[in-house]
């Protein structure tokens, strides 16, 4: 085991998986190279690149920055720019997509408001094939804008698939609740098919006395809507959207798991998406990409990063509860450094799943095993293998030269944050920034905000390209300039050698939704 671990640790700088830098296949893949691709590799469709342009963009020496040719291809005059890595993988493993989603109630679906109409439905499951909208005699649905970024590792397969299909899973999940969301004055029913009460959302539940008396609206009352128990939780509409996004991420991950036996879907990916629905932004993140809002020069974080360090306690607790997942090769405990055999019987600082601080424990044989989480900062890895703990894919990922699967420690669940556009009057320089970790590895939130607040005021407010140029400026600042000692940014710091993808989304368009 020690030899295997040394080999894995030696590959820390080679990529997110030990021994897989630049590879199109994850460890232990099910013969993926002999299977057809689920979707062909390419760059985001909204860039409008020809095949020749795609090939030219994959220049690891020049690293040309790609931007939108036509701003009308993205809603809200959104800006976008990207650049390929400096050679760590053959392809740019980032993927992006942006669409306007139309959500209609499924035909024949149970609804909370009988006799309401819904007009379009999917003619197939969300597998990206045969997707069309069919007219019927039911009500109008709702439209929402969708932006997404996927940062692939150990190949671009999972990122490409997620960029094509996740939006369909989101639409599918929203279809069951679209009529409920449109009726914001009434709290969601506990069971679909119940007629909602015509009362404000803040006065749904009965008092205990009314419930016991059997009065109007009480259990057993002959003239009122379904029973409302006084202990029933009040679920706001926003929680339904959050649940839909969480379910969509889970279904996307399950689809990748199912289809990897039929298609070559390499590696895994992080996922950062935004939907604008009924005047609110919902930002869902699984991985280490990041979203921030810059409003009047103020920075508003809209995501958290999920890494071995930030999720240490969750990972340790899982390993503590299910020690077989460690394969008798790892310890779930954390120590300041590797424990040496000569330290048996001595007391050393350690940290367990229930601790944020440190304590001393007597070193035992079990503590000599390799730690579940090893390394610091960007070099921290789960089982010396992967540096992100949430995302999609990675179903075949194993510890280097072993049969220990890492997927049980990885989660597809996103964190979802909400921003209410209607609460603010946004200016033309107020923006939402979405970017993969290639940007954030070298630029802080403050540096990005400073760059935006310096750049946008110097652009014509009526120039539709201003946000694309701002995205290009951010990518250029993070990539830097190629010098004798590699890519360098300001103050001669090392530039980002990773793939970089950036959206700059102007929030002024949200004013129209208020």
Swiss-Prot record:
User: Is RNA-binding included in the keywords of this UniProt record?
Assistant: no
SMART domains listed in its UniProt record: PP2Cc
Q: What are its E.C. numbers?
A: 3.1.3.16
- Phosphoserine modification sites? 7, 124, 211, 221, 422
Is Phosphoprotein a UniProt keyword of this protein? yes
Region of interest: Disordered: 109-135
* Disulfide-bonded cysteines: none
Q: Which residues carry this modification: Phosphothreonine?
A: 113, 224
Q: Which GO terms describe its biological process?
A: signal transduction
Please give the catalytic activity noted in the UniProt record.
Answer: O-phospho-L-seryl-[protein] + H2O = L-seryl-[protein] + phosphate; O-phospho-L-threonyl-[protein] + H2O = L-threonyl-[protein] + phosphate
Which positions carry Omega-N-methylarginine? 213
Location in the cell: Nucleus; Cytoplasm
| Domain of life where this protein originates | Eukaryota
- Entry's Pfam families? PP2C
Q: Which InterPro entries match?
A: PP2C, PPM-type-like_dom_sf, PPM-type_phosphatase-like_dom
What Gene Ontology cellular component terms go with this record? cytoplasm; glutamatergic synapse; mitochondrion; nucleoplasm; nucleus
For this UniProt entry, the molecular function terms from Gene Ontology, in alphabetical order, are:
[pyruvate dehydrogenase (acetyl-transferring)]-phosphatase activity; identical protein binding; phosphoprotein phosphatase activity
Which keywords does UniProt give here?
Answer: Cytoplasm, Hydrolase, Methylation, Nucleus, Phosphoprotein, Protein phosphatase
User: What's this protein's function?
Assistant: Dephosphorylates CDKN1B at 'Thr-187', thus removing a signal for proteasomal degradation.
* Miscellaneous remark of the record: May act as a suppressor of trastuzumab resistance.
User: What's the protein here called?
Assistant: Protein phosphatase 1H
Q: Which species is the source of this protein?
A: Homo sapiens
Lineage, highest ranks first: Eukaryota, Metazoa, Chordata, Craniata, Vertebrata
Gene that codes for this? Answer: PPM1H
